[in-house]
Amino acid sequence: MIDEIRKDAETRMKKSIEAFRAELRKIRTGRAHTNLLDHISVTYYGTEVPLNQAASVKVEDARTLSVIPFEKSMVPEVEKAIQSSDLGLTPTTAGTVIRIPMPPLTEDRRKELVKVVRSEAEQARVAIRNIRRDANSDLKELLKEKEISEDEERGGEDAIQKLTDKYTGEVDRILQEKEKELMEI
């Protein structure tokens, strides 16, 4: 019983970390990386599809992405989708290749992004603490139904707290890496 609650809490905490990482991948640093365009979608034969299903995205160099739509007719559609995204990018098209230079981030923009990253980290920490609360309330429920002893409940709560500390520490470590990445010029 206690082990199941602990395993469930750990699985949910891992998912929170993955969701946090996914959110951070969407935040533009000064470097080019293919994940940057993951959340952009284009209209492909009347259906909204993720950009990576309508074009190949490659890193040309540290500050340039190249996007090659699978069909020539999609070039203007893809270019428009990139321009209208919230990333502030200006693509240039040469034939079927769309090049996206990464403009360097201004100091103000870097500070704004650090605030966004910290906010995302706090949301991840809150999610992890909520998982701890749920697990602890499950343990209390088992105690109330006399399925476990008070000592077992305390041991379970300690195990859940150790998991919480481990995963909030992971959030802090990821946050520090991202802040460092954002602040380097």
From Swiss-Prot:
GO molecular function: ribosomal large subunit binding
Principal location listed in the UniProt entry: cytoplasm
CDD domains for the chain: RRF (cd00520)
SUPFAM superfamilies for the chain: Ribosome recycling factor, RRF
Entry keyword annotation includes Cytoplasm: yes
GO BP: any one term: cytoplasmic translational termination
UniProt keyword annotations, A-Z: Cytoplasm, Protein biosynthesis
Subcellular compartments: Cytoplasm
Listed GO CC annotations: cytosol
Known role: Responsible for the release of ribosomes from messenger RNA at the termination of protein biosynthesis. May increase the efficiency of translation by recycling ribosomes from one round of translation to another.
Record-stated family: Belongs to the RRF family.
Protein name per Swiss-Prot or TrEMBL: Ribosome-recycling factor
Organism name: Alkalilimnicola ehrlichii (strain ATCC BAA-1101 / DSM 17681 / MLHE-1)
